[in-house]
Amino acid sequence: MNSAGRVHRSRAGSRGHAAISPLTMASFSVARGIRSSNVYDDTDDELSILTFFSAVRRNRLTSSLPPILSARCSSACFSVRIVLPLSLTISISALMYSTNSALGRKLTGAFSIQTNIEQSCGFFRTSIMATLPPIECPIIIGPPLVFNSCFVIKCFTSSDMTS
């Protein structure tokens, strides 16, 4: 990641190396706290299959990541972008993850985050880079191991904090 908070991606050397972590980014847009859009970008489909779903209820954006299909040690990186009109402000009060794996492990806690706020064309664009810790799984021969995991990202607008 460079100083502006952007991630440089490269596919070079990504094939055939178990140590390479999949990098998947999703952008979520919230307009006036009542609508959302979802952008899916899988940058390394060889290592994992990741899909995002998003929903907004009472200005709360929740994104869930369904089961990860992987036969290698893996980690994932998510970029959450929230765009609001200048008349609204955003307050990040929680950015959490929770998993339940098929191996019996349960991980909960806060993401490590870096926030970059820009003002453009009457909107604030708040980009949050959230990085999950690695999810370790055994190197196996045969079908990929399916993790029964769900990551939840919660972002709150300022109006949600006062309601």
Curated annotation (Swiss-Prot):
Recorded phenotype for the gene knockout or disruption: Hypersensitive to cell wall-perturbing agent calcofluor white (CFW) at 37 degrees Celsius. A similar phenotype is observed at 30 degrees Celsius, although the severity is decreased. Decreased expression of genes contributing to cell wall organization during vegetative growth.
GO CC field: cell periphery; plasma membrane
Disulfide bonds: none
Membrane topology label: Single-pass membrane protein
Location (main, coarse): membrane
Single GO biological process annotation from the record: cell wall biogenesis
Subcellular compartments: Membrane
Assigned keywords, A-Z: Cell wall biogenesis/degradation, Membrane, Transmembrane, Transmembrane helix
Transmembrane segments: 76-96
Induction, per UniProt: Expression is dependent upon the presence of the cell wall integrity pathway mitogen-activated protein kinase SLT2 and its downstream transcription factor RLM1.
Function: Involved in yeast cell wall biogenesis.
Protein name: Protein NAG1
Gene name as annotated: NAG1
